[in-house]
Amino acid sequence: MAQVKRIRRNVSGIILLDKPLGFTSNAALQKVRWLLNAEKAGHTGSLDPLATGVLPLCFGEATKFSQYLLDSDKSYETLAQLGKTTTTADSEGEVLLTRPVTVGRDDIEAALPHFRGQISQIPPMYSALKRDGQPLYKLARAGEVVEREPRSVTIARLELLACEGDTARLSVDCSKGTYIRTLVEDIGEKLGCGAYVAELRRTQAGPFTLAQTVTLEELEQVHADGGNEAVDRFLMPSDSGLLDWPLLKFSEHSSFYWLHGQPVRAPDAPKFGMVRVQDHEGRFIGIGEVAEDGRIAPRRLIRSE
């Protein structure tokens, strides 16, 4: 007998997951997608299996805006293990070198200013970046090491929260593309003892914080009690990650033409940049960009939610 294909639901919005330890970002996404029985899903940038914390998951129409969350700033807390370096720059790798730890709080505090502001990082081999279509981590597992171009990132804040024995707990606010494993490893080299990431927790992604997240266990319990539709209550609006963008409200006439791909004028539009747009009934209908002539050109449109 042929297997009956599961009919997925057309649901839209963002669920802020507190990603559990040991899950890849995609595994967490697929689990929540199953709980929702959602037709379309995507996440907004990977967290290592070792990492926990804020992982925005986009469903339906919200996937059209995931790139803007991917580009947003992030915040982390990490526990650095001093005195050792590993193949992966975290606790999941093999130890490459062990050195004595002779530094204390004052030494760590003195080293941190070197890593604030705009800095250069060489991405780790164990990363999802690709070389000739092949993820670097696959090359690394095969024993290959390839040259990686340094990348410029911004560390807006780097603070020492605690220092105990041969560990240091750090808090970091950083730009997209920052590798906390590389940051910790570089700090360890600056201290002369080496270091790797023992724990990593993302505390903020763009406008989203840990206080807004839901755990996988909570979602599973709600699903067990009420099925797919019960999980819908955790869905945030598709534009939740864009609330700091200028908001324009179009008339019914302007909304019609704009939704058909026509640039329109808006008297209260900013002089430049991206905007989010609502129709005359207050429904989010997409994002646009202010053109040179002052009209709002549609960039990403959505169906009514």
Curated annotation (Swiss-Prot):
Keywords: Isomerase, tRNA processing
Lineage top rank: taxon: Bacteria
Catalytic activity: uridine(55) in tRNA = pseudouridine(55) in tRNA
Coiled coil (UniProt feature): none
GO molecular function list: RNA binding; tRNA pseudouridine(55) synthase activity
EC annotation from Swiss-Prot or TrEMBL: 5.4.99.25
Entry annotation: catalytic residues: D48
Record-level GO BP terms: mRNA pseudouridine synthesis; tRNA pseudouridine synthesis
Enzyme type, top EC level: isomerase
InterPro entries: PsdUridine_synth_cat_dom_sf (IPR020103), PsdUridine_synth_N (IPR002501), PUA-like_sf (IPR015947), PUA_sf (IPR036974), tRNA_psdUridine_synth_TruB (IPR014780), tRNA_sdUridine_synth_fam1_C (IPR015240), TruB_C (IPR032819)
NCBIfam families per record: TruB
Role, per record: Responsible for synthesis of pseudouridine from uracil-55 in the psi GC loop of transfer RNAs.
Family: Belongs to the pseudouridine synthase TruB family. Type 1 subfamily.
PANTHER family reported in the protein's UniProt record: PSEUDOURIDYLATE SYNTHASE TRUB1, TRNA-PSEUDOURIDINE SYNTHASE
Name of the protein: tRNA pseudouridine synthase B
Protein species of origin: Pseudomonas syringae pv. syringae (strain B728a)
